[in-house]
Amino acid sequence: MSSKLFCLRSFPSVQRTAWQRLVLPSTRKFSLTPTTFDKTPSGRIPPDQKAANIISSVPSTSLLTKSGVLTVTAAALATAISKGIYVVNDESIVVASFLGLVGVFGTLGRKAYNEWSDKTIAKIGGIMQAARNDHTSAIRERIDQVASLQEVESVTQALFHTSKETARMEAEIFELEQRVALAKEAKSVLDSWVHHEANVRAEQQERLVEDVLARVNSKVSTQKFQQDALNESLGEIEKVLASA
């Protein structure tokens, strides 16, 4: 009873149509003259296109499998209705309407989802392409930087030879400085020895002079030396007077 009330409240057009079909007399007029019907009236989908849409909506991959699924489903439904296993009632109408609404929303949502997924995929693809381009440009810049250092080996070798020559010259300069310092030290030692020898000689000469003077004074102070010197002086005077 509740399902009937829900059906009457939710689908008044369905209830009205069923009532008109059951109660009201048929007002359709029949004519014996042949009438030509338009198979594709305006505003309606052709049967072949509708069949193609139904077949394409079946979840399968091949056309044969889709046709088999539809055939088996229709046969099972007809068998269930004919055997009384399944009875069409208000609940069936509600379920069918719900499934129809779900199908409509699914179709509309599929389009929106496809658009959203396409935009998302395009956005992610753009981000990945931009990252790829940035990575490619970074690699190219690095390759250019490395290419500019192709002559680094020759420059390094030249710097190595220069540093080696500089080290050799510094060693020679240090050796010369040591030699100059040694020569200065030897000169200072020799100068000190010369000065010492000069002092020693001066002292020896002074001692010799003092010794000679002492000896002379000692000889001069003797009586004999004075007498000999006086006699020699007198002899020299006599020689001078004789020659004059």
Swiss-Prot record:
One of its GO terms (molecular function) is proton transmembrane transporter activity. One of its GO terms (biological process) is proton motive force-driven mitochondrial ATP synthesis. It is found in: Mitochondrion; Mitochondrion inner membrane. Pfam families: Mt_ATP-synt_B (PF05405). Keywords: CF(0), Hydrogen ion transport, Ion transport, Membrane, Mitochondrion, Mitochondrion inner membrane, Transit peptide, Transport. GO terms for cellular component: matrix side of mitochondrial inner membrane; mitochondrion; proton-transporting ATP synthase complex. The keyword Transport applies. Residues 1-36 form a transit peptide. Belongs to the eukaryotic ATPase B chain family. F-type ATPases have 2 components, CF(1) - the catalytic core - and CF(0) - the membrane proton channel. In yeast, the dimeric form of ATP synthase consists of 17 polypeptides: alpha, beta, gamma, delta, epsilon, 4 (B), 5 (OSCP), 6 (A), 8, 9 (C), d, E (Tim11), f, g, h, i/j and k. PANTHER family: ATP SYNTHASE F(0) COMPLEX SUBUNIT B1, MITOCHONDRIAL, MITOCHONDRIAL ATP SYNTHASE B CHAIN. Mitochondrial membrane ATP synthase (F(1)F(0) ATP synthase or Complex V) produces ATP from ADP in the presence of a proton gradient across the membrane which is generated by electron transport complexes of the respiratory chain. F-type ATPases consist of two structural domains, F(1) - containing the extramembraneous catalytic core, and F(0) - containing the membrane proton channel, linked together by a central stalk and a peripheral stalk. During catalysis, ATP synthesis in the catalytic domain of F(1) is coupled via a rotary mechanism of the central stalk subunits to proton translocation. This is ATP synthase subunit 4, mitochondrial.
